A protein has these predicted regions:
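Hydrophobic alpha-helical transmembrane segments of membrane proteins
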Residues: 1-7, 31, 68-96, 101-115, ...
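Helix-loop-helix units of permease transmembrane domains in multi-pass membrane transporters
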Residues: 2-35
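Short loop/turn hinge sites at secondary-structure boundaries
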Residues: 11, 57-58, 191
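Hydrophobic alpha-helical segments at protein termini of multi-pass membrane proteins
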Residues: 15, 46-50, 222
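Secretory targeting signals
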Residues: 27-100, 109, 116-117, 131-142
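Generic recognition of short, well-ordered alpha-helical interface segments
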Residues: 65, 82, 98, 102, ...
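Terminal transmembrane helical anchor/hairpin motif
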Residues: 106-219
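Transmembrane alpha-helical segments of polytopic membrane transport and secretion proteins
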Residues: 226-227
């Protein structure tokens, strides 16, 4: 599978567009090819890790949830596919597309952690691509079960919702005023059910995917191609 930026870089975009096929069909074909590639990759990865776990540790619980994990992984990754596709269509460079998406991912994860834990404004991270806000169930982050709200965690959160539908996730920040050296004081901010986290992350992921794909399609439809 070659990306749109790869077609521009290699020059194959010219004969490709010369074929009696619309640009919309070509664009949708690239998206479909990316989806199939992800589906095959994740299926093989999950099958490999599951088989390894069975061979090493014996029978495992909740294997019936593997399709849910696969579906969640696809949802989470498609948003990054859309970002790469948009950057590649805009700049016609695979390098810029890949490094740009990687930079966005690193920025949202690193800066997001600081914003959430220290500033207590982690709710913002729920509405941008990445790992999202960090919360916990059953106590502060040091003793509770960690839960992240972002689009990167749709699969794990779907499984958490199926196994623990009554979970309430609490978000915390470090109280810098009252914390002593080596002993952080965690201040609870707000709580929301795991069902709301799952619903919000899916809606956010789909919204970004649709908008980014629409922009990419618009740019590709109007791109000037010269031999």
């Amino acid at each position: 599978m070659n990306t749109i930026s790869g077609e521009f870089e290699s020059g194959t975009i010219v004969p490709l567009l010369a074929k009696p096929v619309s640009r919309t069909t070509i664009f949708l074909g690239k998206i479909f090819a990316a989806f199939l590639t992800l589906l095959v990759t994740y299926t093989l990865l999950i099958a490999y890790t599951t088989l390894g776990g069975l061979l090493i540790y014996g029978p495992q619980n909740n294997l019936h949830l593997l399709p849910i994990s696969l579906l969640g992984s696809l949802f989470s990754t498609l948003i990054w596919v859309a970002i790469v596709l948009l950057l590649g269509t805009l700049f016609r460079s695979s390098l810029i597309a890949a490094t740009g998406a990687l930079g966005i991912w690193l920025g949202t994860n690193i800066i997001g952690s600081i914003i959430g834990v220290l500033a207590g404004q982690g709710w913002i991270l729920t509405y941008i691509p990445g790992s999202g806000n960090n919360g916990s169930v059953g106590g502060n982050p040091l003793v509770g079960t960690a839960v992240s709200t972002g689009t990167d965690n749709i699969g794990p959160n779907l499984i958490n919702y199926i196994l623990h539908p009554s979970w309430d996730v609490t978000y915390y920040k470090i109280d810098l005023t009252n914390s002593t050296q080596g002993t952080p004081i965690w201040q609870a901010l707000n709580t929301e059910p795991i069902s709301a986290i799952v619903f919000t992350s899916i809606v956010v992921a789909l919204s970004y995917f649709v908008v980014l794909i629409a922009i990419s399609w618009f740019v590709f439809k109007r791109a000037q191609v010269t031999e």
